[in-house]
């Protein structure tokens, strides 16, 4: 008898997984995976509240902090790391914390998730403040490490969010903004790296992306604040300027170089026919929002 938890229950559709052909197993997994985005869709009302609050706190100087263990922790670290090149965020603005530290990204750290106090220490080490948003991620909804992190964050006055894949989760009782996504039993019983992990990844994609849209790091659907750390991203940066300003690639490259590789500044320069200094001033006066800076005609 498995425990009364959806993520630990046996999946009736895969009771004979070991007897299926490779193709049958693939078709079954694919069918199960199709349930995930539909389950996430049901959580949009809760996610809307989470993202609006996160945008507000970010604008006040708060940080977005993910905390979790195992797969959940790794997904948080991954999302935080990707925000740096995608949105040119400071590594200290969006942070992923995993039980057991960085070593746990590639190796299992035995027992790390079982200690509530460890999460408190990890949050103290980054000087958690009341401006921050702490998102606790746990498929089961009852991981002690995440419980400890959210509990401590509440005492600091930080905004707390929980993401779980079970209904009536323990962490939902602790967080100010609980999000529960019921994806059903896993293809492989209890292996929450599967449907639960997919759901968590989709949710983190939504939270970070739409938050960054809300703070002005996107123009239309373009990565206007992209940080070019390699040749591919340099080329993308120039093409973004080219696309928005409707100019040639070479003209866009010239703006990119004059702006000292700042896509936002280069775009405002190109759209308004102004100097780097004037473009910088307009962005500063308009909350770093490119469209507002372009419309700004004040001397």
Curated annotation (Swiss-Prot):
It comes from Staphylococcus aureus (strain NCTC 8325 / PS 47). The active site is at 82 (proton donor), 113. Belongs to the GCKR-like family. MurNAc-6-P etherase subfamily. This is N-acetylmuramic acid 6-phosphate etherase. The keyword Transferase does not apply. A lyase-type mechanism (elimination/hydration) is suggested for the cleavage of the lactyl ether bond of MurNAc 6-phosphate, with the formation of an alpha,beta-unsaturated aldehyde intermediate with (E)-stereochemistry, followed by the syn addition of water to give product. It is an enzyme of class 4 (lyase). The lineage of its organism: Bacteria, Bacillati, Bacillota, Bacilli, Bacillales. The keyword rRNA-binding does not apply. It catalyses: N-acetyl-D-muramate 6-phosphate + H2O = N-acetyl-D-glucosamine 6-phosphate + (R)-lactate. The gene is murQ. GO terms for biological process: amino sugar catabolic process; N-acetylmuramic acid catabolic process; peptidoglycan turnover.
């Amino acid at each position: 008898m498995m425990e009364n938890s959806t993520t630990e229950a046996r999946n009736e559709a895969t009771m004979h997984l070991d007897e299926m052909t490779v193709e049958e197993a693939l078709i079954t997994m694919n069918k199960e995976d199709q349930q995930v985005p539909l389950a996430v869709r049901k959580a949009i009302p809760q996610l809307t509240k989470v993202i609006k609050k996160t945008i507000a706190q970010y604008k006040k100087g708060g940080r977005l902090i993910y905390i979790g263990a195992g797969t959940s922790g790794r997904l948080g670290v991954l999302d935080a790391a990707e925000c740096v090149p995608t949105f040119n965020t400071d590594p200290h603005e969006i942070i992923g914390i995993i039980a057991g530290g960085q070593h746990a990204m590639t190796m299992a750290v035995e027992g790390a998730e079982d200690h509530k106090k460890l999460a408190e220490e990890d949050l103290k080490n980054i000087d958690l403040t009341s401006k921050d948003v702490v998102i606790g991620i746990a498929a089961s909804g009852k991981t002690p490490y995440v419980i400890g992190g959210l509990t401590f964050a509440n005492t600091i006055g930080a905004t707390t969010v929980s993401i779980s894949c079970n209904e009536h989760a323990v962490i939902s009782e602790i967080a100010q903004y609980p999000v529960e996504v019921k994806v059903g039993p896993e293809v492989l019983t209890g292996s929450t790296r599967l449907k639960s992990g997919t759901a968590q990844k989709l949710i983190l994609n939504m939270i970070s992306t739409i938050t960054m849209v809300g703070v002005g790091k996107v123009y239309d659907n373009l990565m206007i604040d992209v940080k070019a750390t390699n040749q591919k991203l340099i080329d993308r940066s120039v093409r973004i300027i080219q696309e928005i300003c409707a100019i040639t690639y070479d003209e866009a490259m010239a703006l990119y170089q004059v702006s000292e590789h700042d896509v936002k500044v280069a775009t405002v320069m190109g759209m308004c026919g102004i100097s780097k200094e004037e473009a910088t001033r307009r962005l500063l006066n308009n909350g770093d929002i490119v469209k507002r800076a372009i419309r700004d005609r004040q001397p």
